[in-house]
From Swiss-Prot:
Membrane topology reported for the UniProt record: Peripheral membrane protein
Gene for this chain: ATP23
GO terms for biological process, alphabetical: mitochondrial protein processing; mitochondrial proton-transporting ATP synthase complex assembly
Organism: Kluyveromyces lactis (strain ATCC 8585 / CBS 2359 / DSM 70799 / NBRC 1267 / NRRL Y-1140 / WM37)
UniProt KW keywords: Hydrolase, Membrane, Metal-binding, Metalloprotease, Mitochondrion, Mitochondrion inner membrane, Protease
Annotated protein name in UniProt: Mitochondrial inner membrane protease ATP23
Recorded family membership: Belongs to the peptidase M76 family.
One of the record's GO cellular component terms: mitochondrial inner membrane
Amino acid sequence: MSVPPPPKEDLIKPNPPKSESAVSGFNWWRRTFQYKTGLGLTPEEETQYENDYKFVLQRKQCSKCYEYRDWLLNYSPTVIFMTQQIAKLNNKNTNADVFKFDESKIICDVCPDWKSGGFHPDLGILICQNRIKDKWHLEDTLAHELVHYFDNLKWEVDWLNLRHHACSEIRASSLSGECRFFQEFARRGFNTGFKVDRGHQACVKRRAAISVSGNPNCRDKEHAERVVDEVWDSCFNDTRPFDEIYR
């Protein structure tokens, strides 16, 4: 089944409001009441309210995203461990006590796609603030992208090479926790093909193939699945920098 595109309104970034007072306090309450009831609202004011509402919503999403990011960088065992390993790769000749991950490499923004995050070898990690459900969803997403970050530093991944891309996607889906039992069951359940035995591996294969299918060098879904199968054994069993699948 094909996935429908995101709503078109998500692709549009709103303009800032005319003033901060227009989106706070009594003025914002009054405008919201007028919009919901239609009382005393001109077409121009209605359009302006819709723009301002999107602005307020995206600002809240952005603030919450960075709040979650900062909390996870300080308290999530998985995220802390991954950032430490990345810092070591970035600073091989530096004393381990001063390893520090640059959190500016993790930014929050609005995304037009359904995905919850992304990684770019030059820019770093993007968290899709409008797709994140809660702190724990962001933890899985951030852990996934940090595996890509680690792989890119350690092996100089060619992201247009389908085998390279597939290998990192397999590792990221397996090690991030996004395919742990309860997470996958919540997404799919028994009625949508979820199996208790080997469910983790099936989830990893499915999600890796979805990601690889978006590579410009991938022809179609079947091509992505075939490439994932080709590199499966070596990549799934490579749990570095963990000793084993942690989550």
